[in-house]
Amino acid sequence: GTGCSSGCHRVGQQCRCG
């Protein structure tokens, strides 16, 4: 699906946390 885990944001094709 779309979106990332809570506290994370999309970076290109992946999600990044912190």
UniProtKB/Swiss-Prot annotation:
MF terms in GO: toxin activity
Record key words, sorted: Amidation, Disulfide bond, Secreted, Toxin
Disulfide feature: C4-C15, C8-C17
Location of this chain's protein in the cell: Secreted
Residue numbers of Glycine amide PTMs: G18
GO terms under cellular component: extracellular region
Expression sites by tissue: Expressed by the venom gland.
Family: Belongs to the poneritoxin-Ae1 family.
This protein's name: U1-poneritoxin-Ae1g
